[in-house]
Amino acid sequence: AAADAGTILSYWKLRDTVADGPFWKGTAARVLSFLLRPGYRRAAQARPEFDRAVRSCLEELQALEQEGSPSLDRTADTFARILAAAALPAESSARTRALEQLLYHVGRWIYLVDAWDDLEEDGRTGSYNPIAARFPEQVEANRDYLRTTLLHSLNLARSACALLELGHWQGAVENILYLGLPMVEELVFTGRWKAVKKRNSRRTDE
């Protein structure tokens, strides 16, 4: 089930790149999405509701980006709903709701941290950035506000996790929520994240 969700997300992300990206980047994504299509079709048959949710949310997000939406809440919510939709129905509605909330707030956190990380590049290329659209003249002045809303989402994700029994995954998920994500956020907001990614990429290639 997790593999199906990953395949669906990968396929629609590639299709989104085809729609939004420059010619050569779009061409590469078009080829990759073509190669992924058989696996995507099988995954979509296994998880049709998730497939519909991803397609719908990406279309909604694309529309918000094209209109230059200044609303952080609307754009982050649209992305977060994609991850929330990945939650499989559990044995109780309370567990399903907790899992949806965990994924939703992690998704919201990812979207906003990624937007901050992309500020410089998006400004250089003229690409839409929800933070720049919300604070066109005072991005840096709203750093604390953004970190506060990120902490709010992280705390809600942690609260949802506390309601779940995740078996052997419990420790790993808690480690991500309490250590991994805060560390990434600190690296992003201090401008060190890109250097860390580059260094890790070199190690992977060796």
Where are the regions a protein language model picked out?
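Acidic catalytic motifs of isoprenoid enzymes
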Residues: A1-Q101, R108, L112-T149, N155, ...
